[in-house]
Amino acid sequence: KENNSEETSERDCIGFCVTGGVFSEGIDLKNESLIGCIIVGTGIPQICTERRLLKDYYDEKDGNGYNYAYTYPGMNKVLQAAGRVIRTMDDVGVIVLLDERFARSEYVRLFPEEWADYKLCNLKEAPKLVAEFWDGHS
């Protein structure tokens, strides 16, 4: 969790983290210390007794149990991870969501309004879109 960005500022590096892990809060990678993230999966929590009880409760209340027990907590993790990239008005970066479920309307409606210009693509098209983004921001 220690921020060693000063030590590595002269070289490019790639870090791998788990959503909801120690890097989800309490670290501030300023300026160009973090210029992108690739989030694999929707962050849905594992099935357990607590989640089943939560799902059952909200299913009875409003029929929306799966979202409260799984979708919303998972998306919260995704948004926290994505939020590491853009911390200030001056930050620029790429957020790539790798999971077909993110293209579904029930996920798109959970995107922040700042993501309104998102692009859908397949894995083959992704490098081109990322390159075009950086060409427009260099």
What spans do the regions from the language model cover?
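ASCE RecA-like P-loop NTPase motor cores
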Residues: 1-138
